[in-house]
Amino acid sequence: DGTPTPLGEETVVVRISDHGELGMSHGGLRQKAFNVYEESIRVPMIFSNPLLFPRGGSSPHPASLLDLLPTLASLLDVEPPPGLRGTDLSPLLRDPGAGPVQESVMFTFDDMHAGTGKVREVVPAAGRIRCIRESRFKYARYFHAEGSFPAEAEMYDLAEDPHELENLAHPGHPRFGDPEVAAQRERLMARLAEAEDRLARPLPN
């Protein structure tokens, strides 16, 4: 009935989702896989507790589902296990107006059948995706470990192009050779490579 209880005051409730839905965006795409568009990878992450967070708020800064465990450990004053991946988001929960606790998050996708031709009716797409997402920019590379699918890349300026219609990583884009765009692209490629070395461990083929 909505009446506060001691259990409610002692419980942190987290509402999340594992993926979004394309909903016919980007020219009629459906489902949620084989892409890094915001409709697919941007999901809610809501923390609720009347004592810890008496006032509502939201933050635009990057966060990942990997951050869930270290954040809960911090809120509960529990020492996280060594080597735990993810970032503590509790500073943002306590002060939504605070600056970012991390500059970017990485998204990965692995499908063991796409592009192999070994399974009937499989999606003819890259089996692996690696993406770096910052507050403003997003860069992704699509590839297949066995080289059966041509490598492709996407880059979007989410401030100027929130619907992700202008792929600045496509050689045919009129701004592809723009020095500022090229510099951002090289920076994002380097950041993604560093994140892959640090975080991503591909599944075996």
Locate the predicted segments by residue.
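Short glycine-enriched, charge-decorated loop/helix-capping segments at active-site entrances
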Residues: 30-32, 59, 170-175
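Polar, surface-exposed loop/tail segments
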Residues: 3-14, 55-130, 183-187, 204-205
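Long, internal low-complexity/basic segments
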Residues: 168-205
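C-terminal, low-complexity/hydrophilic appendages and adjacent surface loops
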Residues: 35-41, 48, 109-170
